């Protein structure tokens, strides 16, 4: 009995080892393929046909990144900073003006001066005033020139961008002389007669047409004359004379 049990036990061990080898050697099952990606949603065009339905659809409202109170607070802070900077610039400008006047406009010492010295001082002051007026005039001329140049450049920019509104022009029929006068101004003095260069066409075609019309009119008269009993009589007589 012991031998039989050992044999069966060995057979069971061999079968168990074979099953383990089969389990190890068995290939892994293939992985399932990933599901296909969903196509992107079609962009709906806002045409006139579906505009009403699009407008009635519930729209998803995007939340703003900054709340209204925060935006108002930032605007007030920016206005306060700009106001403080403007006040500081005005104060600096006033201090600079006072310093310049203190350097260039010193108080006059008129005590103890004679009449001739006062006259000389007045002449010197008038000469300085003339120099200052000349400088002021030159500066104003430069400023006006720069302003006109800036306006011209701004107009060119608007022309290039096409933002200016074109006026509604009306078509006007102009002759050659009027057109040349508009282009050249007073320089144009020679009158241009464009009809002088045209070729003269003979009226033979018109005469032929009149002749054809005349012939057609005569034929109609002959038809009217041959109609009726008298016409048949004339036609019979003419055919009889031709037969004889």
Swiss-Prot record:
Pfam families: Troponin
Source organism, top-level taxon: Eukaryota
Compositionally biased residues, Acidic residues: 1-25
Molecular function, one GO term: actin binding
GO biological process: cardiac muscle contraction; skeletal muscle contraction
Gene Ontology cellular component list: troponin complex
Keyword hit for Acetylation: yes
Tissue expression summary: Heart.
Modified sites of kind N-acetylserine: 2
Region entry Disordered, spans: 1-67
The keyword Protein transport belongs to this UniProt entry's keyword annotation: no
Family of this protein: Belongs to the troponin I family.
Listed name of the protein: Troponin I, cardiac muscle
């Amino acid at each position: 009995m012991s031998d039989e049990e050992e044999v069966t036990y060995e057979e069971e061990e061999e079968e168990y080892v074979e099953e383990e080898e089969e389990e190890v050697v068995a290939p892994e099952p293939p992985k399932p393929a990933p599901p296909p990606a969903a196509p992107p949603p079609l962009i709906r065009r806002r045409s006139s046909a579906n505009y009403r339905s699009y407008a009635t659809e519930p729209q998803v409202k995007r939340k703003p990144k900054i709340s209204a109170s925060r935006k108002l607070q930032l605007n007030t802070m920016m206005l306060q900073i700009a106001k403080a900077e403007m006040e500081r610039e005005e104060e600096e400008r006033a201090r600079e003006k006072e310093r310049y006047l203190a350097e260039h406009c010193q108080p006059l010492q008129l005590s103890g001066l004679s009449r001739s010295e006062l006259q000389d001082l007045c002449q010197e002051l008038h000469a300085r005033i003339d120099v200052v007026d000349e400088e002021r005039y030159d500066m104003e001329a430069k400023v006006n020139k720069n302003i006109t140049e800036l306006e011209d450049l701004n107009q060119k920019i608007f022309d290039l961008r096409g933002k200016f509104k074109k006026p509604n022009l009306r078509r006007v029929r102009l002759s050659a002389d009027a057109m040349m006068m508009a282009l050249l101004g007073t320089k144009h003095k020679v009158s241009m007669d464009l009809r002088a260069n045209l070729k003269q066409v003979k009226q033979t075609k018109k005469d032929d047409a009149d002749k054809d019309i005349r012939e057609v009119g005569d034929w109609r008269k002959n038809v009217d004359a041959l109609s009726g009993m008298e016409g048949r009589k004339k036609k019979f007589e003419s055919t009889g004379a031709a037969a004889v």
